[in-house]
Amino acid sequence: MATVTVNTLEFVSALRALIPISKQATLYSGEKERNAATIAARITPAKKLALITGNSALGAIASVGIEQAVEAGEREFCLYTDDAKNITSIFKPNKQNSEEPLRLEFGNQLDNENIMIAETHKAYGNTELIVGNLAEDAEITDTLLNDLYLSVNNPEAPESPSFNVIKVAAFTTASKIYGEAATRVTGSDAGRIRHLIYGTHLHGVIALDRGMEDSEVATLVSEARNTVLETMGNRA
């Protein structure tokens, strides 16, 4: 699995360089490299394209790479973004040319944009959405997730699509994260969840739980940066 840390100007080059070469590429922007490095360190490697973006510009850049991957037959995407509005435009009905679900995993904290995403994809047919989140108030989070589920699984809606929302995690305190996660993964959804997806603010929780110091987190970031620079240099 290639772990890539790049700044905004390098992001397009990294996408174009890695997407055709490997189906196991994790790409994320330098804007949130501390967050992304620690998240990447915990994600189970999987054959999917993962993107972490931090603003509209990066979202637009990432959408270009995703659209190319969809056209190439990719069906699974793990999206980490604080501004996902640009992502939604590229999953168009004419891209739904397979009976296999298009799996979309959103790793940011659930908000109104995510609900908008769900409403947008509701019209796109055979789609599966996995929402992962870290919330201070689990009750509020559950309400949002339930509303989201109902909005995309309304049996009375005309031509209701196959659109499943899997609630991955809603935690009252950060200290419960791994116990709760383990319970959920070994539960009824275990066969459907490839790996856990959490929010962009999770890096502090991971660092605390793993006993990592800031210097260790910085080392992860440095190693990731060196990896992509070396990789891109070898493939230039």
State where each predicted segment sits.
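DNA polymerase processivity clamps
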Residues: 1-236
